[in-house]
């Protein structure tokens, strides 16, 4: 199945994509993206869409790796999309069950990351 995150997993590459500026790409599970936006909402009150969750997931992994390797620096990501229009999907527990998405393992990993700086990917 392709991604349930809008705009991710499309068969075409957007004209604005500039591969020369990409340092690294990683696969992010849909459940991880959705756990990230729910964490953002819980911590900040900000509604964000799934692609923002994908960015947060990647940023958390990068920060954890930097800490583990002793690297200092800044990590910047974008809050790409508002999430209000996803109230009946990404933010709806019944929808998650219908889609067979379990965000709890990711939510637990994010809490652990925020408390320790260590992030490990749950087994899928």
What is the role of each PLM region?
Residues 31, 53, 82-84:
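Short Gly/Pro-enriched loop/turn and capping motifs at secondary-structure junctions
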């Amino acid at each position: 199945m392709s991604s349930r995150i809008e705009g991710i997993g499309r068969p075409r590459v957007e004209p604005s994509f500039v591969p020369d500026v990409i340092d690294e790409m990683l696969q992010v599970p849909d459940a991880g993206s959705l756990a990230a936006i729910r964490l953002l909402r819980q911590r900040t009150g900000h509604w964000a869409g799934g692609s923002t969750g994908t960015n947060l997931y990647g940023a958390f992994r990068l920060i954890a790796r930097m800490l583990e390797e002793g690297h200092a620096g800044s990590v910047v990501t974008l809050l790409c999309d508002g999430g209000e229009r996803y109230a009946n999907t990404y933010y709806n527990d019944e929808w998650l069950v219908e889609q067979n998405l379990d965000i709890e393992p990711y939510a637990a990993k994010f809490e652990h990351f925020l408390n320790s700086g260590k992030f490990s990917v749950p087994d899928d």
